[in-house]
Amino acid sequence: MTLKEAYSYAVTFLERNGVDESDFKALCVVCSILNIKNSEYDLHRNDFVPNKKLADMLWKLKDGQPLQYVLGKWDFCESEFYIGEGVLIPRPETEELVEKAIDYIKTLEKCTVYDLCAGSGCIGLSIAKKCKNAFVYL
């Protein structure tokens, strides 16, 4: 089925099964299968989407698995992080806090940051990427 057909099918499937934010989750799933950004959907509407992969991901969402675990990745502070079961899911609130920390750290001559045993490492890696004056331990 095409990306456009897969998206339509996914929205209907998720809505019928009571999954919240079915439009957004369907878009994320179908674009993830083709390894494209959500914003590139229109450019790939007629590309082929494997049915089995789509079905597997939709059933996981239906069963209540978080979208981030189903996708296996999530964006945080302009970078993509791999997310699996047992790893804390990066939240928008955390991203906002990290951006404030980055702004503060940039005002310092040097700084040491520890991001230990927190999951994906998205906090420490985001700080390391944007703050050359920080020594970050993961």
List each model region and its residues.
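Conserved SAM/SAH cofactor-binding pocket of Class I
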Residues: 93-138
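A general structural signal for well-ordered alpha-helical segments in protein cores
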Residues: 7, 26-27, 54, 64-67, ...
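Ubiquitous "structural anchor" signal
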Residues: 18, 72, 80, 127-134
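Conserved AdoMet
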Residues: 31-103
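A short N-terminal interaction module
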Residues: 1-50, 54
